[in-house]
């Protein structure tokens, strides 16, 4: 028998690229228009400070746990270690759900970008768009199935390529910036004075899209088992966050100094493409368009890797049946990749009948991943409290509390209704979790406590279905 070669390890640069690439997808290119629809520049800046601080607390929590618990693999492992296997399943299944729903958003906005070059794709939700998106989805699945580490190496190159249009846009934004235009309605009223109630409402309205663009910051943690050094995953999370925050603030705020808020809010999506076209002429639209396409393909590549890796790790830890962890000669989780791609395909075909596919998919994506983030913060609190006498753990306890409070506020602002819809997708997952328990010698399909939580999830799912049927949630 031939001895298997050990899997190649991913270095720090590739891990940082994974964090940046998995977060910079479609969101940053439409960020200005989405924010201008919700807020003036003053509240936007305050919201960035709040979201940046909250995400930093999450990143520091991840970094601390990676250092303190180096044997754990994957973001859901913290929930399992701190609160039991069912919590680990809830976290892992939610992360997997978030990842492939994110791929659906990439498909819809990619078709919009292609529509700038080829009018047949402009509607984003016609049959040609869905067919092309389907081919891309299965092609990326095939590529990742050829080897996860190989995909990560190419991801480093893709990240460099897609940052160039963003940096060029930021440079022109600085050069063409008009201070008087930026400050004339800084707080979104005629006197441009600070009015607390109005400002707080604007901050709340733009929090959702800001949290969406940070989805993926934990990417290095998910592949920490394959890092050359365990510490690299934590460093990549922090460095990736700092880079992302700088890019997002500049890309979203500078256009307020070039066009009025009303003009920005009414501009077509992808907003950055059309803003840059106004700045420099027709070539600007093509330049940003190519960058957007590369950006989405890079993020889509990352999020093809991550959900499959999640299923693989969950199967290894007996949270899913063993067949979810089957790998090929390249060490890629083939079964998990095919299952995930199949679900994406089903969702893509539903785009023929939905009206707000992009918003619906990214709202579900954000709501489901916030659950994972909450459990990370909760375990950070539990671990720090249990080791309170060790150096630095009082500060880590505070970091965990702040991260948890931020995520709770996030789920409330993201919309509890979308979380209830996510519960629908948990029901088949709970079946697989129960089968894994039985396969590993447990007498009962679920424990009493797990049945109680399952009942709550089912009730929540029924409420979610009612919200859709009654028209309170538009899909």
UniProtKB/Swiss-Prot annotation:
The keyword Membrane applies. GO terms for biological process: arginine catabolic process; L-arginine transmembrane transport. Its main location: membrane. It is a multi-pass membrane protein. Keywords: Amino-acid transport, Antiport, Cell membrane, Membrane, Transmembrane, Transmembrane helix, Transport. One of its GO terms (cellular component) is plasma membrane. The chain crosses the membrane at residues 10-30, 42-62, 74-94, 101-121, 157-177, 205-225, 238-258, 283-303, 333-353, 361-381, 397-417, 451-471. NCBIfam families: 2A0302, arg_ornith_anti. PANTHER family: AMINO ACID TRANSPORTER-RELATED (PTHR42770), ARGININE_ORNITHINE ANTIPORTER-RELATED (PTHR42770:SF4). Belongs to the amino acid-polyamine-organocation (APC) superfamily. Basic amino acid/polyamine antiporter (APA) (TC 2.A.3.2) family. This is Arginine/ornithine antiporter.
């Amino acid at each position: 028998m031939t001895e298997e070669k050990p899997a190649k390890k991913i270095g720090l640069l590739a891990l940082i690229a994974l964090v940046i690439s998995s977060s910079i997808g479609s969101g940053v290119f439409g960020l200005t228009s989405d924010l201008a629809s919700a807020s003036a520049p003053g509240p936007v800046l305050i919201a960035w400070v709040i979201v940046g601080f909250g995400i930093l607390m999450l990143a520091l929590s991840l970094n601390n746990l990676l250092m303190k618990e180096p044997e754990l693999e994957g973001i859901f492992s913290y929930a399992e270690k701190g609160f039991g296997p069912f919590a680990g399943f809830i976290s892992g299944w939610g992360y997997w759900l978030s990842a492939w729903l994110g791929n659906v958003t990439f498909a819809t906005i990619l078709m919009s970008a292609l529509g700038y070059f080829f009018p047949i794709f402009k509607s984003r939700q016609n049959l040609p768009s869905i067919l092309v998106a389907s081919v891309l989805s299965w092609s990326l699945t095939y590529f990742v199935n050829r080897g996860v580490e190989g995909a990560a190496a190419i991801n480093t190159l893709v990240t460099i390529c897609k940052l160039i249009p963003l940096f060029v846009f930021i440079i022109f934004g600085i050069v063409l910036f008009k201070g008087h235009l930026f400050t004339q309605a800084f707080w979104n009223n005629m006197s441009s004075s600070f009015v607390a109630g109005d400002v707080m409402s604007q901050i709340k309205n733009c929090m959702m899209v800001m949290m969406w663009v940070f989805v993926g910051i934990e990417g290095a943690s998910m592949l920490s088992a394959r890092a050359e050094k365990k510490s690299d995953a934590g460093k990549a999370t922090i460095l990736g966050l700092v880079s992302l925050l700088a890019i997002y603030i500049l890309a979203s705020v500078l256009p307020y100094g070039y066009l009025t808020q009303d003009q920005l809010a009414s501009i077509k999506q992808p907003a950055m493409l059309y803003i840059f076209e106004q700045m420099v002429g027709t070539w600007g639209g093509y330049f940003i368009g190519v960058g957007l396409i590369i950006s989405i393909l890079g993020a889509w590549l990352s999020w093809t890797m991550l959900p499959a890796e999640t299923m693989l790790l969950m199967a290894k830890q007996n949270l899913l049946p063993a067949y979810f962890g089957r790998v090929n000669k390249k060490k890629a989780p083939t079964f998990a990749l095919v299952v995930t791609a199949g679900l994406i395909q089903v969702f893509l075909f539903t785009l023929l009948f939905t009206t707000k596919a992009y918003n619906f998919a990214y709202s579900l994506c954000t709501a489901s991943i916030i659950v994972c983030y909450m459990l990370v913060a909760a375990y950070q609190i539990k671990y720090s409290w249990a080791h309170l006498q060790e150096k630095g753990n009082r500060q880590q306890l505070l970091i965990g509390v702040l991260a948890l409070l931020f995520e709770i506020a996030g789920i409330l602002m993201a919309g509890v209704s979308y979380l209830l819809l996510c519960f629908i997708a948990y029901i088949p997952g709970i079946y697989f979790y129960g089968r894994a328990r039985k396969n590993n010698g447990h007498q009962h399909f679920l424990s009493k406590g797990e049945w109680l939580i399952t009942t709550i999830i089912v009730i929540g799912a029924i409420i979610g279905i009612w919200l859709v049927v009654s028209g309170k949630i538009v899909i």
